[in-house]
Amino acid sequence: MNADYIDMLKCLNKAGVDYILVGGWAVNMYGCIRATVDLDIWILADSENAKKVYAAVAEFGAPVSEMKPEEFAEYGMIFQIGVAPCRVDIISKISGVSYADAATRAVSKTIDGIPVRIISLEDLIANKKASGRAKDMADVEVLEGFRK
């Protein structure tokens, strides 16, 4: 994991943000190694967490001066920092699973010494199936092999 991603995770943890790691990095955490151009951070979309997210991304150095913290509480919000292949995507919605349900099943892991919560294997598969993109369906095929 690159230094910017590590710094972002540290900022999120320091601010006490309620988040779950999803997307390509979550896929990689289950042993299905594939290239990814971003770090997908799924946040709880509520006003209290939005303030924490705002503080974390500001500390990270993201351009938030034109934003209001409550924008991070909007369901369906996407906030991108940087450009691929080193982009951070902060999102408040994914397909196929609700945050409330996913949060109860999220798996605690450590990445480069940083504690993170990763979307559960079952929820990751549900999300990938719901998205329907070719690369996600390829992930599903491999991830389903880890169910056994």
Predicted regions and their residues:
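Compositionally biased terminal segments of proteins
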Residues: 1-148
